[in-house]
Amino acid sequence: MKGEASQVMITLTVDVEEGFHGLWPSARRTMIRYMHELPEGTFVRPLRSILKLFEEEHVRSTFFVLGKIAEAFPEVVEEIHDLGHEVASHGYSHVDLTKISLTELEEMERKNYDRLTKITGEVPRGFRAPFFGINPSIISLLSKIGYVYDSSVVPSLGIPGWWSYHSASLRAHCVSVGEGEFFEVPISVFPYLRLPIGGWFLRNFGVTYVKTAIKWFLSRGIPTIIYVHPFDVDLNAQKLGGTHFYATRRCGKYTLKAMKNLLETFDCQKVPIRDMLEKIMV
């Protein structure tokens, strides 16, 4: 590891998916029930709001793109890449990868790896599993395919519907996968409470909660990894009926302003994960 001063960094990552993909089951069922009323590609407008914010704040970040999104909207993936952001994989389909055979998973993920490479002209380096579901066998497979890091581990307390690893390291670290070198880049959590600080937690717990966690990480020289989704800044999300209020609470302007607040509050590097790894790993 290099000196702590070089590790004062924030990466505000974006999981590029449709709104119904990442919600808790009750909200997801409602979204799917009304999908025939929703135009395909409802993620595009809020995604472009995020891209615009990043341009205004001179921020480059990592976008984990779902394979089905890349398949249907290659021009959107190309747009992300052309703006200087890192394009990484969010898996081909938004399902729990731990419930799929490794043979089927390899076929799916090689397909997405090749597709992202074709669209961007660069091989994707990073991966984030849907629902943060990862295990050593999947890590080995990702390394075999060609990925060099994963950012799926959430070192948090157990949360229903999620994979949680409460005893995992808070720092990016190298993991053993045979002859290759592979890195795990854990998603940042609130200290002591061990709860996530992105997405739903940013919206429901508020920006001060997230800023407190970031200060804790940066004061210890630990790069901070936060995640959001286009859904989190979608102005239409709160119009969806049939879900608990907290599923869509503060989607839209609040979250976009909160992201702007976070980016402007901290005078440190805001970089893609690939760049962060190059800076902190010897």
Residue ranges and their predicted role:
Residues M1-G126, F131-P186, F190, V207-V282:
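Catalytic alpha-helical scaffold of carbohydrate-active enzymes acting on polysaccharides/glycoconjugates
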Residues P124, R194-N204:
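Surface-exposed cleft-lining segments at the edges of enzyme active sites
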